[in-house]
Amino acid sequence: MIAKNIDVKLNVRPIYIGLVHEYAYEGPCRFGEGDALEKEYDQMVSRETYEIFKQDVFSHVPAGINMMDPIYLEATDEWVNSEKIYETLSAEIDKIDLFVFNFQIARGFIYVEFAQRFHKPVAMIPHSCCEETLNTAALHARGHEAYAFYSWADYEGYLRALRTRKALQNTRVLVASRFSSVKSYGGTDNFVNLEEITNRLGVKFRNISVHELLDQLHEVDPYSNPTIPGRKGQNINAEDTALAEKLADEFIANADEVRMDRAAIIDTFKAYVLVQKLMDHYECNAFTAPCPDLCSTRRLSEERVTFCLTHSLNIENGIPSACDLDFNSLLTQAVLENLSGKSVYMGNANVCSLEDGKLPTIFGDFDDAHIDHLDDKTNLYSMFHATPTRKFDGFEQPLKKYSVDSFAYSGFGATVRYDFMQDEGQEITVCRIDPTGTKMLAAKGTIVASAGYDGKSCGPLD
């Protein structure tokens, strides 16, 4: 079973710290009269505030967040920093990703020492009188991870972001490579240093030879693969072939149009099923394979497969997947899918500026006819790849309309062909992580045109 990073949960522990005065008195930090100065009154108010706190935090739980049992604590005006406090706070600490606190004046010393002791991310809920900014500043100055929020909507956004960070930390990429497991021959803007990506983001990379992978496409004795003679491979078997046939028939049945042979589609699904087996075997939940250097082996041509459909199906099932060893795209997918709950489209990007009023030839059949309906032909930008998915509306939503055609003109390599005009006017996010892995471009766009639905190779295009 592949442990998908979209299923990762962020474990959050809510903590409320009340303040109980042991004696009745007034002073510069305490004021009131009558029963309001009694210890029992403080305890009553603290409990009431705790109930409000619980209602607030459990009313703002985004998808993928696991709110753990809350903790109630009482500090006193003895200012004794009791060890029992930290024993209580640290219960199940290895399971917890974020501690969310609520308290008011004169309890921040507990918050700060907790972060110093245990080095876990902490946060304060919005609207905690006076305490959010000063305690966050105190911890930032000491080099600790701490958050404060402008509003509950802001709070929920940070929870989603922190869950996405955890999803990245739980991403393990199966890298099929020929010459190099770090260098892409079709994408020089790839990550410069994968070790740095692992150190900073926690993403792990597991390697397999493309030849070892392709050998296992054959339904033969798994000990007979020429690349690993005598060692058991994960070769597809009769059960896997039956599954590939079943998946292919479902793929055909759900399509508006199919323009290639069923047998060739089944071959493509065998590659998909094999990649699932290998990800499961190596305990990975993401996949990438090279393009130009794999293509030039002629093995894809001999095996009559491409990995385009494997990438499409992986992505629409919440498994980051990229051609051309495009690690940047892979991790961008992980970020976007975890934040949005929708599948994404991986594509090559191009500026479409008109020259002498006409669209320059960029790729395939994308020409002026595809943008004639536009009144405004400025600021156009195109993306294309043979890896659209059928789940752009969400992982749990019905399939979008699509057709099926081969990548190769000789009829092999099934691909999803998608008409983006069915999403005309849809606002989208265009996103890319830079080669250093330290910056991300995120921009808004609107779908206004489409091409390549009836074509082959690396389309469709939007």
Placement of each model-derived feature along the sequence:
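Short hydrophobic segments within beta-strands
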Residues: 15-17, 125, 174-176
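Conserved, well-structured core segments that form the ligand-binding/active-site neighborhood
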Residues: 131-342
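Glycine- and acidic-residue-enriched helix-capping/strand-helix junction motifs
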Residues: 21-51, 181-192
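Surface-exposed beta-strand edges and their flanking turn/coil or helix-capping segments
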Residues: 25-28, 137, 161, 220-223, ...
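Well-ordered mid-protein domain cores that form the structural environment of catalytic cofactors
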Residues: 78-159
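Anaerobic metallocofactor- and corrinoid-dependent redox/one-carbon enzyme cores
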Residues: 3-16, 29, 37-79, 102-104, ...
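Generic detector of short, locally flexible boundary/turn motifs and exposed helical patches
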Residues: 32-36, 62-66, 86-92, 111-115, ...
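Short N-terminal or domain-adjacent regulatory/targeting segments
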Residues: 1-32, 145-164
